[in-house]
UniProtKB/Swiss-Prot annotation:
Stretches assigned to the Extracellular side: 1-31, 82-105, 167-202, 264-277
Lipid bilayer topology: Multi-pass membrane protein
Protein name: Olfactory receptor 56B4
Originating gene: OR56B4
Provenance organism: Homo sapiens
Record key words, sorted: Cell membrane, Disulfide bond, G-protein coupled receptor, Membrane, Olfaction, Receptor, Sensory transduction, Transducer, Transmembrane, Transmembrane helix
Length: 319
C-alpha cells in the first residue's frame, strides 16, 4: 500500500499528500450532492459576473457604494472558486488526494478571501453611516480615492495577517495520518493530523478570528446601530423608508456572511453528527457568494434596473 495513503504511526515518516475523504458518514452517496452544489457554484459565478459587468456598463452605478459591491463580487468569485472545483472533483472523479503545498495554498486563499470579505462589509457599513448620518460631508469624504485606499488597506491587512496561517501549518510534522474528514483543507482539520504540538497554530487561528473578523463585525453592527438610531429620528417617512431599504440589503449580505459560520464555529452537534459542521463549512463558502447578488438585486433599485437594461429587459435605467 502507498505510504502516502496508509495510516501509520512511524514518526520518522513524512507524508507527501493529504486525502480529503469528503463528507463524514455519507461517503457512499455524497456524489448526489454535487448537483445542488454545482448549481450554487454556477449561480455564484454567473450572478457575481453580472454584477461586475452591470456596474462597469452603467455610468449611473459609478458610485462608491456600487464600487464596493463590485469588489465584493470579485471576492465572492474567488472564495467559491477556491473550494468548489476540488469538491466537485472529489464527488465526481474520487480525486481525493491533494499535495501538501496545494492544501496549504487553499488554506491561505480561504482565510484571505474570507477576511477580505469581512473588511469589505466594514467599508460598506462606513459608507452607509456617512451617507445617512453625515449626508452633507458624504461627497467630500466618500470618493473614489477613499474607496481605493480603504480596499487597498483591507487587502494588504488581510493578505499579510493571514500568511502565518499556512506557514505555521507547513511547519508542523505530518508523520502518521493523512486522511482528512472534510471536502476542503480547513486549517484546524489539517493541523489536527500533525505529530507535534499545534498550540501556536490554534492560538493564531483564534487571534486572527477575533482581531480581524471579530473587530470588523463589531464595528459593522455598531455602525448600523448608530444608523438605525439616526433613521428613527427622521421626520420624513419617505426618507426613513429609503434609508432602511438601502441598509437592509447590506444587512442581508452580512447575515449571509456571519450566520452559517456562527453555526459552524459553535458546532454544537459535532460530537453526535460530525457531518453537520463539515457541511456547514462547505455551505458557508458557496451560499453567500451565490445569494449575495440576489439580495442586492432585490433591495437595490438602481442595480436591479441596471440588470434589466443589460439583459435587454428594460429600456432606460433612469426610469
Amino acid at each position: 500500500m502507498d505510504t502516502s495513503t496508509s495510516v501509520t504511526y512511524d514518526s520518522s515518516l513524512q507524508i507527501s499528500q493529504f486525502i480529503l475523504m469528503g463528507l463524514p458518514g455519507i461517503h457512499e452517496w455524497q456524489h448526489w450532492l454535487s448537483l445542488p452544489l454545482t448549481l450554487l457554484y454556477l449561480l455564484a459565478l454567473g450572478a457575481n459576473l453580472l454584477i461586475i459587468i452591470t456596474i462597469q456598463h452603467e455610468t449611473v452605478l459609478h458610485e462608491p457604494m456600487y464600487h464596493l459591491l463590485g469588489i465584493l463580487a470579485v471576492v465572492d468569485i474567488g472564495l467559491a472558486t477556491t473550494i468548489m472545483p476540488k469538491i466537485l472533483a472529489i464527488f465526481w472523479f474520487d480525486a481525493k488526494a491533494i499535495s501538501l503545498p496545494m492544501c496549504f495554498a487553499q488554506i491561505y486563499a480561504i482565510h484571505c478571501f474570507f477576511c477580505i470579505e469581512s473588511g469589505i462589509f466594514l467599508c460598506m457599513a462606513v459608507d452607509r453611516y456617512i451617507a445617512i448620518c453625515r449626508p452633507l460631508q458624504y461627497p467630500s469624504i466618500v470618493t473614489k480615492a477613499f474607496v481605493f485606499k480603504a480596499t487597498g488597506f483591507i487587502m494588504l491587512r488581510n493578505g499579510l495577517l493571514t500568511i502565518p496561517v499556512p506557514i505555521l501549518a507547513a511547519q508542523r510534522h505530518y508523520c502518521s495520518r493523512n486522511e482528512i474528514e472534510h471536502c476542503l483543507c480547513s486549517n484546524l482539520g489539517v493541523i489536527s493530523l500533525a505529530c507535534d504540538d499545534i498550540t501556536v497554530n490554534k492560538f493564531y487561528q483564534l487571534m486572527l478570528a477575533w482581531v480581524l473578523v471579530g473587530s470588523d463585525m463589531a464595528l459593522v453592527f455598531s455602525s448600523y446601530a448608530v444608523i438605525l438610531h439616526s433613521v428613527l429620528r427622521l421626520n420624513s417617512a419617505e426618507a426613513m423608508s429609503k434609508a432602511l431599504s438601502t441598509c437592509s440589503s447590506h444587512l442581508i449580505l452580512i447575515l449571509f456572511h456571519t450566520g452559517i459560520i456562527v453555526l459552524s464555529v459553535t458546532h454544537l452537534a459535532e460530537k453526535k453528527i460530525p457531518l453537520i459542521p463539515v457541511f456547514l463549512n462547505v455551505l458557508h463558502n458557496v451560499i453567500p457568494p451565490a445569494l449575495n447578488p440576489l439580495a442586492c438585486a432585490l433591495r437595490m433599485h438602481k442595480l436591479r434596473l441596471g440588470f434589466q437594461r443589460l439583459l435587454g429587459l428594460g429600456q432606460d435605467v433612469s426610469k
